[in-house]
Amino acid sequence: MIIVTGGAGFIGSNIVKALNDKGITDILVVDNLKDGTKFVNLVDLNIADYMDKEDFLIQIMAGEEFGDVEAIFHEGACSSTTEWDGKYMMDNNYQYSKELLHYCLEREIPFLYASSAATYGGRTSDFIESREYEKPLNVYGYSKFLFDEYVRQILPEANSQIVGFRYFNVYGPREGHKGSMASVAFHLNTQLNNGESPKLFEGSENFKRDFVYVGDVADVNLWFLENGVSGIFNLGTGRAESFQAVADATLAYHKKGQIEYIPFPDKLKGRYQAFTQADLTNLRAAGYDKPFKTVAEGVTEYMAWLNRDA
């Protein structure tokens, strides 16, 4: 069995899909379906069982067994960069991850987990997986950073695989439940389909991010499980492309629309990553050599998926 926490969420459900594509269906999905809309991410997938995250954590802390577990993909977390309840964030992202890590170490179960590019904070260069480059801007980024630091202490002595992925700006299918945290491509598509003007912040040609397609993210996760490599790795494309490029690709797909530029909100000033670009040196050195989709390629594929029933 393979366990996927956050398996009804964005990246988790795409990992389940990638496993299904390889013929793997003996999957336990762990999530919190209080937001009942997330079920749509699983409705076309095949899994063996579902468990609520609170029940799962209780069983993990009690040392209960789940049969022959081949790996745990730990994607479950509070991923809102605008959530400022530090106790909630640390319980949900840090303590929970530690419990799961030790459970895996004791049983030598491969543990593959979601870190984040938010660990780098407001950098504009040198997004490198090393302490001197890390300075998160929000408590979400701090919770991810602190767990990475915890993992770094354990990695040299670990007898089983531990790998963390610093996700950059992931976009693609199965993110609709994320609301305001969904990607720009998702929101632009929704606005166009609602007959509204697609909106970007003023200066969006200058805001550049490393936008990585979720299908590529799932592929990297599965490659690492198959190859048993440990460590903490950036997971982006290695390219910074502008929000304007995302909009251009979206409008090109729809063949309509005129961007409306809106003022940059004061509340985001100083807390907004204006530039991200993954340094892929370590990922490539680990042996992962496949190309990543460009924004034009990924957004076009995503638009086709979003509008498949249109």
Curated annotation (Swiss-Prot):
Modified residues (N6-acetyllysine): 267
Activity-pH dependence: Optimum pH is 5.5-9.5.
Database matches in SUPFAM superfamilies: NAD(P)-binding Rossmann-fold domains
Induction: By heat shock.
Annotated GO biological process: ADP-L-glycero-beta-D-manno-heptose biosynthetic process; lipopolysaccharide core region biosynthetic process
Keyword Lyase: no
Keywords for the protein's UniProt record, in alphabetical order: Acetylation, Carbohydrate metabolism, Isomerase, Lipopolysaccharide biosynthesis, NAD, NADP, Stress response
Note accompanying the cofactor annotation: Binds 1 NADP(+) per subunit. NAD(+) can substitute for NADP(+), but enzymatic activity is reduced.
Reactions that this protein is recorded to catalyse: ADP-D-glycero-beta-D-manno-heptose = ADP-L-glycero-beta-D-manno-heptose
Extra remark beyond the main annotation: Essential for E.coli viability at elevated temperatures. Insertional inactivation of the gene by the Tn5 transposon results in E.coli being unable to form colonies at temperatures above 43 degrees Celsius.
Family assignment from sequence similarity: Belongs to the NAD(P)-dependent epimerase/dehydratase family. HldD subfamily.
Function (record text): Catalyzes the interconversion between ADP-D-glycero-beta-D-manno-heptose and ADP-L-glycero-beta-D-manno-heptose via an epimerization at carbon 6 of the heptose.
Written domain comment of the UniProt record: Contains a large N-terminal NADP-binding domain associated with a modified Rossman fold, and a smaller C-terminal substrate-binding domain.
NCBIfam families attached to this UniProt entry: heptose_epim (TIGR02197), PRK11150.1 (NF008360)
The protein, known as: ADP-L-glycero-D-manno-heptose-6-epimerase
Species assigned in the record: Escherichia coli (strain K12)
Taxonomic lineage: Bacteria, Pseudomonadati, Pseudomonadota, Gammaproteobacteria, Enterobacterales
Gene: hldD
